[in-house]
């Protein structure tokens, strides 16, 4: 029978002080995807790695309230709060989609104090492609 030798003070797989470093991100790209049902705001660095994201649904809005301008404003403020703390000063904004939250999200981004290099609208527009959904009758 083998005798076990206990080492005093030994730590296996110990990770002392290996917390992930919060790096400074001076500039980035803010993507706003505004559909009729929800608004998703994603903040990336220049290389495209996601730093922060938020959506109206993740901010606590459920159902039809997710598509409102106020929900989009809350989602944008939520996503940007973390990157402002990491030192983001300049950003490019890329907006996609026809939703109601486009302008509200852009207003929240402008209010955050980040300098905007440009605002680009990349909403896909069909050149008479697929048939559009029928109009609602309420």
Swiss-Prot record:
Cell location: Plastid, Chloroplast
Sorted UniProt keywords: Chloroplast, Plastid, Ribonucleoprotein, Ribosomal protein, RNA-binding, rRNA-binding
Sequence segments annotated as region (Disordered): 1-21
Disulfide bridge positions per record: none
Major subcellular site: plastid
MF terms in GO: rRNA binding; structural constituent of ribosome
Cited InterPro entries: Ribosomal_uS11, Ribosomal_uS11_bac-type, Ribosomal_uS11_CS, Ribosomal_uS11_sf
Family: Belongs to the universal ribosomal protein uS11 family.
Entries under HAMAP family matching the protein: Ribosomal_uS11
Subunit structure, as described in the record: Part of the 30S ribosomal subunit.
Record protein name field: Small ribosomal subunit protein uS11c
């Amino acid at each position: 029978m083998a005798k076990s030798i206990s080492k005093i003070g030994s730590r296996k797989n110990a990770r002392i002080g290996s917390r992930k470093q919060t790096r400074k991100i001076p500039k980035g790209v803010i993507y706003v995807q505004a559909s009729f049902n929800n608004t998703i705001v994603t903040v990336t660095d220049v290389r495209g790695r996601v730093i922060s994201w938020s959506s109206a649904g993740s901010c606590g809005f459920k159902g039809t309230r997710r598509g409102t301008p106020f929900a989009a404003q809350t989602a944008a403020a939520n996503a940007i709060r973390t990157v402002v703390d990491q030192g983001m000063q300049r950003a490019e904004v890329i907006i996609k989609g026809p939703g109601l939250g486009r302008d509200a999200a852009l207003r929240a981004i402008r209010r955050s104090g980040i300098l905007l290099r440009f605002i680009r609208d990349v909403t896909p527009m069909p050149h008479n492609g697929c048939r559009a959904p029928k109009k609602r009758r309420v």
